């Protein structure tokens, strides 16, 4: 098929999530209102570290992907697909990283649509992910572990383990 793997990163992904229940927090240090030190802030958006943040982000991106015509597979969460004119597009969501493969024209269009809704960084073709190096050729893709620095410069002794 010759499908390439593309990678995008959603900047400040959790801040895109909307908190559906009432959540309050103390005023942040440095932003305390004089004479109202005991007041708290009601959150409208998710913050990093908030236990509801991953769920709020996932709900937000899931809704948007559905609006774009994606369907989530029943076999695996965070794996989406869509087919337009017999041209497939597959999207994998991993926290704040998106991976796309399929028809190149559809990938380009999808990247534009995602960037309109979320602040994104297009990382282009995937080269690294979760400690794996990804090599992509015209009709093949290889995964391999990334050697640590000692392995690369030949200083690691097998007996050190």
Where are these regions (language model features)?
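Long, low-complexity, charge-biased intrinsically disordered regions
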Residues: 1-161
